[in-house]
Amino acid sequence: MPSLNDSVKLPCGLVLPNRLAKAAMAEMLGGFQNIPTPALINVYDQWAKGGWGAVLTGNVQVDVNHLGTPFDPSLSGEYIDAETNKDLFEQYRKYAEVSQAHGTPAIVQLCHPGRQSPRGAGRKGLLGSTMAPSAIPLDMGAGFVQRWLSWLVFPPPREMTQGDIETVTRQFVDAARLMADAGFSGIELHGAHGYLIDQFLNPKSNTRTDAYGGSAANRAKFVLDIIAQTRAVVPSTFCIGIKFNSADHHSSSFEDTMTQIGLLVDAGIDFIEISGGSYEDPKMFNSGLQQAEKSARTAAREAFFLEFSAAVRERYPTLILMLTGGFRSRAGADYALSQNACDLVGIGRPAAIDPHFPKLLLDESVQESEAELHLNRIPVPFWAKWIPLAAIGAGAESTYYTGQIQRIAKGLKTIVPL
């Protein structure tokens, strides 16, 4: 059975020193200029010292006009390097240097939110439109209140033109090239949680009838083009991974999902991170609510997407898989590895409480009963209970842990939810 302490070599040749990856989380530390601020770099200085096998950053948006939050780090949408924008390039170079100062590879999560860009987030302004594969607004519930609140927060998207698709593809490629030039070890394309790449992959949000819609393969064309064009401009040793939503075994989309994963494998993807959820179905954002007991059965429940990951492993045995969502203990992480369901264990919220969490899990002198971190549910604000949106409760969870990340940035002690 693999050990958490074992190294992992990705197809590109990048070696991760152990199997614990700090998963991407929203830091909201890009400031009003949406750049890698000193506060953001302070946080990654702590994670760099934490003993992780890999550190995945929070979202870096590829177009400052379309952000997931008003404070996401982002790029202008145009290619930059040390000559075209020396100051911004230097900020990303410093970000990479600090994040990897202690030998842990840092991988940047690149994202475009598509229709999940709230009003006022990005330079599109309050009245600017979002874009999506098809002009289908977010469906956050059938009731009048849900529909009104959804419209209030997320403007209805316009369908992307061929020119839009080519522009956004180039923005992803240019962003990846910048990260390689700045010294990061790789990128992860955010293809989950309802963001733009996921919107193309999903038939519910992509009803196009051109080369980017219809079949599972056509719906994957957008991300496959990004991968192919990125490979052409970055070193062969630069990692390209993707975060990918799980699918229910019994759903009609399961085989389509497996087909798309196969296309990603054929494209030479270095790893796939299995995750899940979106603003319409925020199960991922409610992760971390189970408490680990000392049984294998409970340890298995720590991994929310274990069954799907195991199915992917069976279909594509050589694919490097990262499983994220719910891990709180060594027992849970060991169980996932023992089931051959993943190669890497992604840990999010515990990293926002204890940036050095791997040191506890990897220290074999620490008893298994002590190698864990209990995190209780964050209470939903009383006013939110009157709003019939599942995303409200999920937002309370995410906001709490973003706040803990910001405490780390200030050098303050984090607060464990009890």
How should each PLM-predicted stretch be described?
Residues 1-418:
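Flavin-dependent oxidoreductase catalytic cores
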